[in-house]
C-alpha cells in the first residue's frame, strides 16, 4: 500500500538572543528491553504569525540524549470540555517514549487558545474543515522553529495526532505540508461538540476533501467502543478519504478498556498500536527500530 517496504532532576530559564523563549527543562530516564538512556523535557514559547499580531504557542520538546541530528515527531493534542485555556499541557508519554527509543525528537505544541498558548480557540458550530485548517499555522510555526535547532534532522518529520489532534493532522496534510513530513498518523480523529448536530456527516464529507488533497501515507486507528465516534462513522470517513488518497491504512483495533478513545493515552494501549505503527514507519522509509533501552 505504501511506497516501500519520572522524575524531573532540574529546571531552569534560558533566553535566546532575538525573541525570548522560556524554557522549563527536566531530565528523565527511560528504558525498554533494549537498554537505558536519558531524555530532556523543555517547555518553550514559539512565535506564530497571527492575523493582527504574533501569538506565543506553548510547546514541549522531548529530546533524546546525544547531539543528533534526530528525526522529528510532532504530536497534536485533543480537546477537553470547558475552557481550552484551562487544559493542561499535553504529555502523551507512551507515544513520547516510543519515539525517544527510536532516537526521535518529539515536539508537542499546544495550539493557539489552549493551555498557556495565546489566542482563542472556539468551534461553536463552524465548519469542521475550517476547524482543522485553522490549526495549520501552528504546525507550520512548530516545524519552522524545529528546523532552527541543530539537533533536528530537517529531512524527516512524522505528524501524529489524537482526537481533534488527529483531525488537525489530516487537515495539515492538505495544506502544502513541509517537504520533511513523510507521514500522517491519526488516532481516533474527530471533532465533536455538545452544541452542534450533524457533525458526523460533515466529517465524512470533509474526509473525502482531505483525501483528494494529499498523497502522504496515512495510518488511522479507531476502536469499537469509542465514546466520541462510532466505528461506522470512522469507516465511512476512511472510505471517503482513501478514495482520494489510496496511500492510507485503517487499523480497526476493536474494543479497548471502557473507552477506545483512551487507547492513545493509556500505557496499556501501546501493545496494541506499537506493531502497526512500527510497520508503518518501516513502510514509509523512516527510522523504526528502537535503539534505546528504557525504564
Annotate each PLM feature.
Residues 183, 189-244:
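The feature captures the conserved acid-bearing segment of alpha/beta-hydrolase catalytic domains
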Amino acid at each position: 500500500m505504501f511506497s516501500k517496504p519520572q522524575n524531573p532532576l532540574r529546571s531552569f530559564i534560558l533566553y535566546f538572543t532575538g525573541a525570548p523563549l522560556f524554557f522549563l527543562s527536566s531530565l528523565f530516564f527511560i528504558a525498554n528491553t533494549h537498554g537505558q538512556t536519558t531524555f530532556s523535557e523543555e517547555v518553550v514559547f514559539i512565535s506564530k504569525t497571527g492575523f493582527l499580531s504574533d501569538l506565543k504557542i506553548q510547546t514541549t520538546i522531548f529530546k533524546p540524549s546525544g547531539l543528533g541530528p534526530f528525526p522529528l515527531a510532532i504530536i497534536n493534542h485533543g480537546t477537553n470540555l470547558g475552557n481550552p485555556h484551562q487544559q493542561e499541557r499535553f504529555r502523551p508519554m507512551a507515544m513520547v517514549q516510543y519515539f525517544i527509543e527510536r532516537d526521535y525528537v518529539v515536539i508537542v505544541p499546544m495550539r493557539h487558545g489552549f493551555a498557556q498558548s495565546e489566542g482563542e480557540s472556539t468551534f461553536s458550530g463552524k465548519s469542521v474543515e475550517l476547524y482543522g485548517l485553522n490549526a495549520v499555522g501552528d504546525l507550520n510555526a512548530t516545524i519552522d522553529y524545529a528546523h532552527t535547532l541543530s539537533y533536528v534532522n530537517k529531512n524527516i518529520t512524522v505528524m501524529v495526532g489524537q482526537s481533534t489532534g488527529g483531525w488537525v493532522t489530516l487537515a495539515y496534510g492538505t495544506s502544502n505540508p513541509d517537504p520533511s513530513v513523510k507521514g500522517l498518523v491519526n488516532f481516533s480523529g474527530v471533532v465533536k461538540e455538545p452544541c452542534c448536530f450533524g457533525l458526523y456527516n460533515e466529517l465524512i464529507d470533509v474526509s473525502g476533501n482531505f483525501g483528494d488533497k494529499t498523497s502522504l501515507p496515512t495510518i488511522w486507528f479507531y476502536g469499537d467502543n469509542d465514546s466520541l465516534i462510532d466505528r461506522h462513522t470512522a469507516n465511512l470517513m476512511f472510505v471517503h478519504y482513501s478514495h482520494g488518497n489510496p496511500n492510507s491504512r485503517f487499523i480497526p483495533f476493536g474494543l479497548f478498556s471502557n473507552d477506545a478513545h483512551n487507547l492513545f493515552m493509556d500505557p496499556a494501549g501501546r501493545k496494541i498500536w506499537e506493531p502497526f505503527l512500527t510497520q508503518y514507519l518501516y513502510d514509509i522509509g523512516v527510522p523504526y527500530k528502537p535503539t534505546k533501552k528504557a525504564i
